[in-house]
């Protein structure tokens, strides 16, 4: 097969795709993946598919899967050229969803798409993904890096994550045991986490704030990019030691939209917003965006990243266990009987 001599010889690189850069990235990230390896991994990076043996000791194992991204928090990371923690966010958004069902995360895969591959940026992001997997106790077994010129501007990139976990069928947490009198425990968030960033960026824009301006012990931009807290290990230990009726990951929609997802029809959640500390970052966002407090609570986590619902007689033990595991915890409310004319979530003490 011969090439025509009267036309320039084109390569994939001429079209904007650098195979060598992709290969260099794979070499850079092998260590990050290897550091997360669980004993059940049979084959990880490099193959067409990762192989993972089911952990032993389960009578009726159920696999739980989830996928998520980090939304427009990515734009903030690119704007600040700070890419070392956005991978932690990606893992957190997936594994925190799995633990809500009582599932232990087993393995994780990522998808990284960009217009022009920067090996340094991508390697930094994937190293963060590895750190997130280590925090969650799951293995980074593979992923896809897609260089797509014309689809993304320059070295802009997008991320998606995919995670699979496992839970004993008889121990699935589905909210069916929730009953009036149960206690709601809130686990403190580490910041805005990974939801509401379109509003965050709009507030920064209209307020004229500088991302490099001081904010507490950091800058405003650094405070906004604080990585999402991963709650997996403390919650797995809690589930082993005390009854848990429901868990709710407080993501987009805040307490108002996420608590109803785990409540049976007869139950409503009554949350005292004065029972937990509102981080100053949320006060800053509310003030500078003139955002109604009800809108704040249906957009942001407002300081509570995960809610645990436990029987009243287990509340003290749960608070003690979570605190001993390093979590900042608050007794934020209780479950009451719900009637049709009432909201499913009542925020006591909310003043607009």
From Swiss-Prot:
It is found in: Cytoplasm. Its EC number is 6.3.3.1. It comes from the Bacteria. Keywords: ATP-binding, Cytoplasm, Ligase, Nucleotide-binding, Purine biosynthesis. The keyword Translocase does not apply. One of its GO terms (biological process) is 'de novo' IMP biosynthetic process. One of its GO terms (molecular function) is ATP binding. The keyword ATP-binding applies. InterPro entries: PurM-like_C_dom, PurM-like_C_sf, PurM-like_N, PurM-like_N_sf, PurM_cligase. GO terms for cellular component: cytosol. It catalyses: 2-formamido-N(1)-(5-O-phospho-beta-D-ribosyl)acetamidine + ATP = 5-amino-1-(5-phospho-beta-D-ribosyl)imidazole + ADP + phosphate + H(+). This is Phosphoribosylformylglycinamidine cyclo-ligase. The gene is purM.
């Amino acid at each position: 097969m011969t090439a025509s001599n009267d036309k320039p010889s084109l390569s994939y690189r001429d079209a904007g795709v650098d195979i060598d850069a992709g290969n260099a990235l794979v070499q850079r990230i092998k260590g990050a993946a290897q550091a997360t390896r669980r004993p059940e991994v049979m084959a990880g990076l490099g193959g067409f598919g990762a192989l993972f043996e089911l952990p032993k000791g389960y009578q009726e194992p159920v696999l739980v899967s989830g996928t998520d991204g980090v939304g427009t928090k990515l734009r903030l990371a690119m704007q600040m050229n700070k890419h070392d923690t956005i991978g932690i966010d990606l893992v957190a958004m997936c594994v925190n969803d799995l633990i809500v069902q009582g599932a232990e995360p087993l393995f994780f895969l990522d998808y990284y798409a960009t217009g022009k591959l920067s090996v340094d940026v991508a390697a930094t992001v994937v190293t963060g993904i590895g750190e997130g997997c280590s925090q969650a106790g799951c293995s980074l077994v593979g992923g896809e890096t897609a260089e797509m010129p014309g689809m993304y501007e320059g070295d802009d990139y997008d991320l998606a994550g995919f995670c699979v976990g496992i839970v004993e069928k008889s121990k699935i947490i589905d909210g069916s045991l929730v009953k009036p009198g149960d206690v709601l425990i809130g686990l403190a968030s580490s910041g805005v986490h990974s939801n509401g960033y379109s509003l965050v960026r709009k507030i920064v824009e209209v307020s004229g704030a500088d991302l490099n301006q001081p904010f507490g012990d950091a800058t405003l931009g650094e405070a906004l990019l604080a990585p999402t807290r991963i709650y997996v290990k403390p919650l797995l230990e809690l589930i082993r030691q005390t009854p848990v009726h429901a868990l709710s990951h407080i993501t987009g929609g805040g307490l108002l939209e996420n608590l109803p997802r785990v409540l049976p029809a007869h139950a409503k959640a009554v949350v005292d917003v004065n029972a937990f500390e509102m981080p100053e970052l949320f006060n800053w966002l509310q003030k500078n965006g003139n955002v109604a407090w009800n809108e704040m609570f249906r957009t942001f986590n407002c300081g509570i990243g995960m809610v645990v619902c436990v029987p009243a007689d287990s509340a003290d033990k749960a608070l003690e266990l979570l605190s001993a595991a390093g979590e900042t915890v608050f007794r934020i409310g209780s479950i009451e009987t719900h009637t049709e004319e009432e909201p499913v979530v009542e925020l006591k003490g909310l003043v607009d």
